[in-house]
């Protein structure tokens, strides 16, 4: 029971998880990060339900949240050296005796038949000698334990790769093709498909307990998509979300190891806010219906030539 009571404060005193910025060596993604980003994005895109677009020609519009930024994190890996280091000092009693010498001063006064003699004794204002005696033994004892990690955090700057957006767009086009849905230029499409990528990035965290430590890197992809028929302006696919995260984790004991390395891919929590519950206003008419074509605000209606091309005429 005593051992358990001692272990509980030892384990809980330094509980905490520090979340930092993923490091890019030389501005390039390291292999594990590439694997995680690809896995989460592939899983999210694969989850998209495109059955309502079977046999249609779709124009695809992908919008990705910007991921450029920078941050600093400094400090080394946790060490328990300072937590249990102790010292004991034993100094003997010390006594010092000072010797102050005395000196006499004599003054003689004479006046005719009268005379007088005055004698005084004084001490010097500084000791002429000092004697120090120590009583007892002097000793010093110390004990400590130092466990260092395999490396330190350094200041890092997050360098965004603009090709990530192109990679994600190509993944979406690949899934469309494999599902049998043709992706065409906007002028030949009968369906507009909008994909908004809200989350597409990585997060690194470190868990530090006295006995257990872990390094965790996660990649998350969260997107929302919907599809609109160009002729009728009706939703073929109501706004839906797809969210997945992949994780790489190394587990240590006293920062020795790792004794366990794991990779997982699983469904993530959905968007904090989505558009699945939005409905048109009751007074919306066909004349002021929204236009879903990009850069088409001045000419919301589709021309006859475009309609003829869609029908293959």
Curated annotation (Swiss-Prot):
Gene Ontology biological-process annotations: cell adhesion
Lipid-substituted positions (N-palmitoyl cysteine): 15
Region (Disordered): 282-313
Signal peptide start and end residues: 1-14
Membrane among keywords: yes
Family from the record: Belongs to the MafA family.
Protein name per the record: Adhesin MafA 2/3
Organism field: Neisseria gonorrhoeae (strain ATCC 700825 / FA 1090)
Lineage of the organism: Bacteria, Pseudomonadati, Pseudomonadota, Betaproteobacteria, Neisseriales
């Amino acid at each position: 029971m005593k051992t358990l009571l001692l272990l509980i404060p030892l384990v809980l005193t330094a509980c905490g998880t520090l979340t930092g910025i993923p490091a890019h060596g030389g501005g390039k993604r390291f292999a594990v990060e590439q694997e995680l980003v690809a896995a989460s994005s592939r899983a999210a895109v694969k989850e998209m339900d495109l059955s309502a677009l079977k046999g249609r020609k779709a124009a695809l519009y992908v919008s990705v949240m910007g991921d450029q930024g920078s941050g600093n994190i400094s400090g080394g890996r946790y060490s328990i050296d300072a937590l249990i280091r102790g010292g004991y000092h034993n100094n003997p009693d010390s006594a010092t005796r000072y010797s102050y010498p005395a000196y006499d001063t004599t003054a003689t006064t004479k006046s005719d038949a009268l005379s007088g003699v005055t004698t005084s004794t004084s001490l010097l204002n500084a000791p002429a000698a000092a004697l120090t005696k120590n009583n007892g033994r002097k000793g010093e004892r110390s004990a400590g334990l130092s466990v260092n990690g395999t490396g330190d955090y350094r200041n890092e700057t997050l360098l965004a790769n603009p090709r990530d957006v192109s990679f994600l767009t190509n993944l979406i086009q690949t899934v469309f093709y494999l599902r049998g849905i043709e992706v065409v230029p906007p002028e030949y499409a009968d369906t507009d498909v909008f994909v908004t990528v809200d989350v597409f990035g990585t997060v690194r965290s470190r868990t530090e307990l006295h006995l257990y430590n872990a390094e965790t890197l996660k990649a998350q992809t969260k997107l929302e998509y919907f599809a609109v028929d160009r002729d009728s302006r009706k939703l073929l696919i109501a706004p839906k979300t797809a969210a997945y995260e992949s994780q790489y984790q190394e587990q240590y004991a006293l920062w020795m190891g790792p004794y366990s390395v794991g990779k997982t891919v699983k469904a993530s929590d959905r968007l904090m806010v989505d558009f699945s519950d939005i409905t048109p206003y009751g007074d919306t008419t066909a004349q002021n219906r929204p236009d879903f074509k990009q850069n088409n605000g001045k000419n919301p209606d589709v021309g006859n030539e475009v309609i003829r091309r869609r029908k293959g005429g």
